[in-house]
Structures are given as structure tokens and as C-alpha cells.
Design a protein with these regions (language model features):
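His/Asp/Glu-enriched short active-site or ligand-binding loop at hydrolase and phosphoryl-transfer sites
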Residues: 191-217, 267
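Short helices/loops that flank or line small-molecule/ion binding pockets
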Residues: 89-99, 116-117, 218-229
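Bacterial Sec-exported substrate-binding components of ABC uptake systems
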Residues: 2-4, 9, 15-52, 148-179, ...
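Short helix-initiation/N-cap motifs at beta->coil->alpha
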Residues: 32-34, 82-92, 107, 211-222
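Flexible loop/hinge segments that line or gate small-molecule binding clefts
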Residues: 72-77, 109-139, 143
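Extracytoplasmic ligand-binding site segments that recognize negatively charged/polar headgroups
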Residues: 124-139, 143, 172-197, 241-243
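Structured C-terminal subdomain patch of bacterial secreted/periplasmic proteins
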Residues: 109, 132-142, 151, 228, ...
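A short, structured surface patch at a secondary-structure boundary
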Residues: 45-107, 119, 203-206
Length: 294
């Protein structure tokens, strides 16, 4: 019942997306995290200081308007990557690119500093839900003159995610899942964005009962994991830390885990697993493929 309701919620967002399909007319006001942001005309020199917003901008069709992205924006490869920091942005360094729009994910004094220089700033923070991720894509589409492109991206994600979720057999909808962030067992609970993605499938997160501080990102012990016996293991530390199904099998006691015995250990690209843009579909596809294994 829960999974069916969640699938319907994902599909229902298509109705909201239809309103964004029109070509953006300027000036336009975007209700962003930093308030109502007025964009007087279509931006032609955009600086993106967030890997996710960079992916969103290129996906909606605004790639040619982007003149610089931060050092962590590694996708798409055609993005103009620089040494700009998205975590500790410097207004003077950003201003050197003569932007008419700066998009970032973290609040801070740099917003006021850039606005003082006459530069429009749009804050699109980390999201908690897929609905919020869709909304950010729509906002970036509207802000850049690509409302129709954004609507197409969102609709494509909705359709693909619904299909992938439904591809997992009913008998696997309650699998116990462990999402690994680091080899020393830092993980994410159902209270996080990625945890809510697992809930779309109906999976049970083994970390939920161990998050005493309610941080959303507890560190588990090896003993706890062996006792929890996850049936699906997702390794989001494959790039940073070289983790794979092979390295997991070499861990003491892990050969007895259901996930290992059933070959339901999947290594995913760290960056794909940590972002909330269009490549979320790739992450869900990898998880669904592993969950379908008998």
C-alpha cells in the first residue's frame, strides 16, 4: 500500500510540471531559498557553484549560457570547470567571470556580497524529497528561459522512476537495505533524501534503528551490520574508496550476509548517489537491477 501511494505521488507531479512547459517570459520572479529573486532578462553568463545545479542547467538546455562552474562540478564533461569553490565561495573570484546570474546551494555572506556588486543570485539548496528536486529543476528552467526544457526533464524522470520502481517484484519490496557512504560504515537513514528514495521501493533501512542522535548519517558498527543482515547493499564509496562487491566479500563475516549470498551488492558512482539531479534515474536503475536478483 505504501509503495503504491508513493508511486502515485511521483506520477501526480506530472500535472504540476505541465504549467512550466511554457517559454519563460522575462522579467520573472523565482521564489528561491534566498527570497523572491527577480530576473530581469534571460541570463547569458551563468556561474554554477553546485554540482547538482550544474547538471540541472545543462539538462534543461541552459548549458551554452554557463560560463563557469565550481571545482566539484564534474558532469557533464563539457561544463566549464574552474577552481571556484562551492563550499567557500569568494565573491571577487566569482565576479571575474562577469556573471549575470550565480546559482549556489549554500547560504552565506557571499550572496549579499554578490548582490552588492549587482549580480543576481539564486540559492537552490540540498533537497529532502524528489518533489523538491523536481521543483528546483523547474525553477532553474524558468530562471534561464528554458521552462519547456525543464518540464521535459521532470516528466522524463517521473516516467522512468515509476517504471523502475514497478520493475522490482512484490516479494522484494521489503528488502533490508544498507547504504554505505564510507568503508567505516557511515550511512544514511530514511530521514535523508537518498533514504526517501529507498522508501519509494518499500525497502527497510537497517540504519534507522541505530540513529540515536537523529543526524540522518550515523556510523554503524561491523557487529551491528552483521546482526541486521541487510539483503541489499549499496556502495556509494566505490570511487572515493575503491569499494566493490569483491572488497565486501573479503570483510570478516560478510560472506554470511543475505546481500552477499544473493549477489545483491551494487557499487554506484559516489557523485551520482549524492546528487539530486537528472542522474537520479541512473542511481535508481542500478538499485532496481540489484533488487530484482533472486
Amino acid at each position: 500500500m505504501l509503495r503504491a501511494s508513493l508511486i502515485l505521488a511521483v506520477a501526480a507531479l506530472a500535472v504540476a510540471g505541465a504549467a512550466s512547459a511554457r517559454t519563460t517570459a522575462f522579467p520573472i520572479t523565482i521564489q528561491a531559498a534566498n527570497g523572491d529573486v527577480v530576473i530581469s532578462k534571460q541570463p547569458t553568463r551563468i556561474v554554477s557553484l553546485s554540482p547538482t545545479t550544474t547538471e540541472d542547467l545543462f539538462a534543461v538546455g541552459a548549458g551554452k549560457q554557463v560560463v563557469a562552474v565550481d571545482e566539484d562540478s564534474d558532469y557533464p564533461k563539457s561544463a566549464p570547470r574552474t577552481k571556484l569553490s562551492g563550499l567557500s565561495p569568494n565573491a571577487e573570484a566569482i565576479a571575474q567571470f562577469r556573471p549575470d546570474l550565480v546559482v549556489l546551494s549554500y547560504p552565506g555572506p557571499v550572496i549579499a556580497q554578490l548582490e552588492k556588486l549587482g549580480i543576481t543570485v539564486l540559492e537552490e539548496p540540498a533537497v529532502d524529497t524528489i518533489a523538491q528536486a523536481y521543483q528546483e529543476i523547474r525553477e532553474l528552467g524558468a530562471a534561464t528561459g528554458h521552462g519547456a526544457g525543464a518540464a521535459k526533464v521532470v516528466r522524463g524522470m517521473e516516467v522512468k522512476l515509476t517504471k523502475l520502481i514497478r520493475s522490482v517484484p512484490k516479494k522484494h519490496r521489503h528488502l533490508r537495505v544498507y547504504h554505505e557512504l564510507t568503508p567505516d560504515y557511515y550511512t544514511a537513514t530514511s530521514a535523508t533524501f537518498i533514504g526517501r528514495v529507498y522508501k519509494l521501493f518499500g525497502f527497510r533501512n537497517v540504519a534507522d534503528a541505530a540513529d540515536a542522535t537523529h543526524s540522518g548519517y550515523p556510523q554503524l558498527s561491523g557487529e551491528y551490520l552483521l546482526s541486521a543482515n541487510p539483503q541489499l547493499v549499496v556502495l556509494a564509496d566505490s570511487v572515493c574508496c575503491g569499494q566493490s562487491a569483491k572488497t565486501v566479500q573479503a570483510r570478516a563475516g560478510w560472506q554470511q550476509l543475505d546481500a552477499v549470498k544473493r549477489h545483491r551488492v551494487v557499487a554506484v558512482d559516489d557523485s551520482v548517489a549524492s546528487r539530486w539531479g537528472p542522474r537520479l534515474v541512473d542511481f535508481v536503475a542500478a538499485v532496481a537491477a540489484a533488487a530484482r536478483r533472486v
